[in-house]
């Protein structure tokens, strides 16, 4: 399913398509190495050569939680150094990328990829539980409950403050 030549696809949209295809093909994977995204993009362009800007878009221009330089898309999210996934609503991002494009418009990509836009909307909506599970602050919820397991919180504070005068 090579990217059709009748639509001059933007490099950022090409990166999004390649990453979305990886997510759809590997639903149990949460993210991908930069090189995996590059290989998938190369596979999609088939007979023509991959444009030189694709790499810098995967590394920087499309990455929501990196400072814009100069591209300010929010199409990818850096989960760890060298790893990316598609950006999701609720992900943190650099404030300078506020309001930036997160998903290609249908008319900007070949018709054979339009189903990816629908797939993404469903994928983005369904995974609220994973986002909560992976949030570092929310992960702390309940982490200290064993401290007060056999003592009321007010009694614990009172005991700590004994002899402060």
Model-derived segments and spans:
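Phospho-regulated, low-complexity intrinsically disordered regions of nuclear gene-regulatory
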Residues: 2-22, 52-139
């Amino acid at each position: 399913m090579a990217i059709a030549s009748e639509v001059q696809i933007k490099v950022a949209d090409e990166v999004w398509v390649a990453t979305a295809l990886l997510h759809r093909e590997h639903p149990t994977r949460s993210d991908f190495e930069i090189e995996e995204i590059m290989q998938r993009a190369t596979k999609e362009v088939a007979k023509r050569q991959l444009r030189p800007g694709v790499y810098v878009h995967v590394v920087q221009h499309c990455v929501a939680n990196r400072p814009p330089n100069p591209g300010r898309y929010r199409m990818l999210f850096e989960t760890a150094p060298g790893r990316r996934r598609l950006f999701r609503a609720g992900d943190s991002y650099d404030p300078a990328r506020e309001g930036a494009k997160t998903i290609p418009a249908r008319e900007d990509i070949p018709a054979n990829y339009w189903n990816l836009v629908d797939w993404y909307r469903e994928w983005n909506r369904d995974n609220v539980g994973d986002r909560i599970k992976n949030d570092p602050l929310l992960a702390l919820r309940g982490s200290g409950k064993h401290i007060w397991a056999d003592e009321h919180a007010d009694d614990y504070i009172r005991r700590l403050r004994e002899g402060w005068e």
